[in-house]
Amino acid sequence: MSQPTRPTATLPDATAPALNRRDLLKQGTAVAATTFFASLGHSGVWAAGSDAPEKKEVKIGFIPLTDCASVVMASVLGIDQKYGVKIIPNKEASWAGVRDKLVNGELDFAHVLYGLIYGVHLGTSGPKKDMAVMMTLNNNGQGLTLSKKLADKGAGNLEGLVALMKKEPREYTFAQTFPTGTHAMWLYYWLASAGINPYKDARAIVVPPPQMVANMRVGNMDGFSVGEPWNHRAIIDGIGVSAATSQDVWKDHPEKVLGTTADFVKQYPNTARAVTAAILEASRWIDGGLQNKMKMADTIAGKAYVNTSVDAINERILGRYQNGMGKTWDDPNHMKF
């Protein structure tokens, strides 16, 4: 049987116009993925033989967020077994902890921020280490939340926030989840678009996603940028309002990825391929229909995973949004897996 033609990646010509940030991310990911999968050579995912996974059991770190779902469901549904591996989801407390455990080998893979992997690879968010992005886990589905106290003063959106900051000058505090992560990017870009310098006109702090709502409740911050379900949780609890969604800022943006180290991929290429295939199948299963999404929400809401109520998860994965101030809408650009 003839071997399938391997995909090739075409790099931009040196004389071509400069890439914008979106094109650069897309092309960089495409080149990395093409190089990896082409190097594996085999079109099948796993067969009992020389391409069997070298490591049968893998630990995958995750943060309690809706977009950890593909990792969790690949394990819960037994999809991983189809590919000859056993996925063990490991609940982590912070993105810094995920970074450290990936780098030192305590975790084999992680549900992780796109920008965290690049930060480690470039040495801008800790010790430099070559990293690998196996696949994008989701697009869209993050948000910018302002406190209900600000909203009650007319600052439930960016325009109102600018007006309030001028009317009542003080140190305004906003939280994001990791310095080189997408949530920092959403927050800084959003503030700067209205003339608010995120480094000079406000105070930015880092708070792990599951702790955002609790910190807003006690008044430690005026707003935050985080993934779901914590934006919706703040609305349900009556302490926050949705000022913007990440898809408002950048439609269909890449968000979390399945990340690992380059060393792991080199040492266990078949395992890397099998794990990626299992999680990709789980992602497709989630997006396969309403019943699947409801089962997913019910599963990840449990204490072992996100530890929140199902209603904090299931509305926004279906695109059913409310802003906490009486506005509701159906968003076709909700989280996609």
Please provide the spans of the model-predicted regions.
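N-terminal secretory signal peptides
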Residues: M1-D23, A38
